Each structure stands twice: as C-alpha cells, then as structure tokens.
C-alpha cells in the first residue's frame, strides 16, 4: 500500500505545471515538523497535484496550513546539461490526491464515487452523509498525466536552499 498523509505549511507559492494536452498541475513544498517529539526538525516535502486539486493548490499562499493525502512517486532530475559526466538523479515526491485546508469548511469540492468508504481521521463515521458531505470529505483527483510536462518552475532553487538550512 502506498499512501502518505502529511500536515504542514506551504514553503512558497506553488509552481504552475501544464502538459502538452493542457492539463493543469501544481508543485509545491510542504514544511512538515517532526512529530516524534525527539527534535524540532523540519522536512521539506515536494508535492505535485493535478486537475481540480492543482487548481485549488494554486490559490494557496506561503504559510497556509494544509493536510495532504497522496502517494509516493519518483521523478527524474536532470543535472547540468553542459557537463558530459552528469548523470540523471531520481528523487521522491508526493502525488497529492486530496488537499484540505483545516481552517476552511469547503476547501475543495469534487465529484465522489458513491462507493467511497469514509476513512478520514477528521470525520466521524456517518451513515447518512449527503452527497455534498462525501464530496468534501473525499475529493477524487484526475488521472496523473505527468508525461510531457512543461513545468513553470521558479522556486526549485529556493526548495534546495530551505532543505539545506535544517
């Protein structure tokens, strides 16, 4: 099972992504505090979202608290192209299926499959949930279409700098 649950604050404005088929995406860094209680270290996690989830993410600002549910994925980082000895490296990221603002009741509304089971840690099980309540609790993202991505990245160096600080 590949599921990730994160809570943290946006490190900087989300970067807008767009595929050749005009699918909208967003990538951002989430600053998460170590919850083990042993230290106060932060981890900066790269997160990518697609479709309606990305449209919602693009409205967020640095410092906004969000809850992210998704899955781990790898992505290829091309090193300097002018260096013939440079090899591609791979890194982990989270592909966000759901993004919630804990301080907003209607942070994201999307269609929901009626067969969805309520398993959110933030909602008590409710047998008479309305369609709108289910849609708010369990947004469904569009298929990941991360091929042929034309990223509009202007904050990746900032992400690396933040990761080195801690």
From Swiss-Prot:
One of its GO terms (cellular component) is nucleoid. One of its GO terms (molecular function) is single-stranded DNA binding. InterPro entries: NA-bd_OB-fold, Primosome_PriB/ssb, ssDNA-bd. Residues 140-166 are annotated as: Disordered. Keywords: DNA-binding. GO terms for biological process: DNA replication. Homotetramer. This is Single-stranded DNA-binding protein. It comes from Mycoplasma pneumoniae (strain ATCC 29342 / M129 / Subtype 1). The gene is ssb.
């Amino acid at each position: 099972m590949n599921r990730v649950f994160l809570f943290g604050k946006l490190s900087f404005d989300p970067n807008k992504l767009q595929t050749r088929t005009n699918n909208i995406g967003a990538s951002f860094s989430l600053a998460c505090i170590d919850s083990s209680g042993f230290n106060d270290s932060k981890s900066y996690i790269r997160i990518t979202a697609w479709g309606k989830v990305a449209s919602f993410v693009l409205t967020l600002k640095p410092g906004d608290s969000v809850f992210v549910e998704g899955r781990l994925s790898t992505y290829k980082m091309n090193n300097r192209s002018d260096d013939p000895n440079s090899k591609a490296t791979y890194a982990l990221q989270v592909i966000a299926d759901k993004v919630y603002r804990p301080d907003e009741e209607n942070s994201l509304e999307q269609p929901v499959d009626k067969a969805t089971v309520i398993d959110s840690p933030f909602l008590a099980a409710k047998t008479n949930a309305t369609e709108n309540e289910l849609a708010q609790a369990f947004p469904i993202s569009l298929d990941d279409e991360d091929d042929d991505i034309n990223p509009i990245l202007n904050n990746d160096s900032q992400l690396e700098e933040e990761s080195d600080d801690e």
